[in-house]
Amino acid sequence: MRVNITLECTECGDRNYITTKNKRENPERIELKKYCPRLRRVTLHRETK
């Protein structure tokens, strides 16, 4: 079952990305390094609901 999730920048708090994940394969929260347009650099983004 795929669900929609939002990725939030851990440094500035902006919610920059919307993606999907498979809850069976990844039951824990996802953490990815993505580009933050406000800070203009790659930062850690965490899953929010």
Curated annotation (Swiss-Prot):
Which InterPro entries does the UniProt entry name for this protein?
Ribosomal_bL33, Ribosomal_bL33_CS, Ribosomal_bL33_sf, Ribosomal_zn-bd
A biological-process GO annotation: translation
Molecular functions per Gene Ontology? structural constituent of ribosome
Q: Which GO terms describe its cellular component?
A: cytoplasm; ribonucleoprotein complex; ribosome
Keyword GTP-binding carried by entry: no
What Gene3D superfamilies has UniProt attached to this entry? Ribosomal protein L33 (2.20.28.120)
Q: Which UniProt keywords apply?
A: Ribonucleoprotein, Ribosomal protein
Q: Which family does it belong to?
A: Belongs to the bacterial ribosomal protein bL33 family.
Q: Which HAMAP family match?
A: Ribosomal_bL33
This chain's protein is named Large ribosomal subunit protein bL33A
- Taxonomic source organism: Listeria monocytogenes serovar 1/2a (strain ATCC BAA-679 / EGD-e)
- What gene is it encoded by? rpmG1
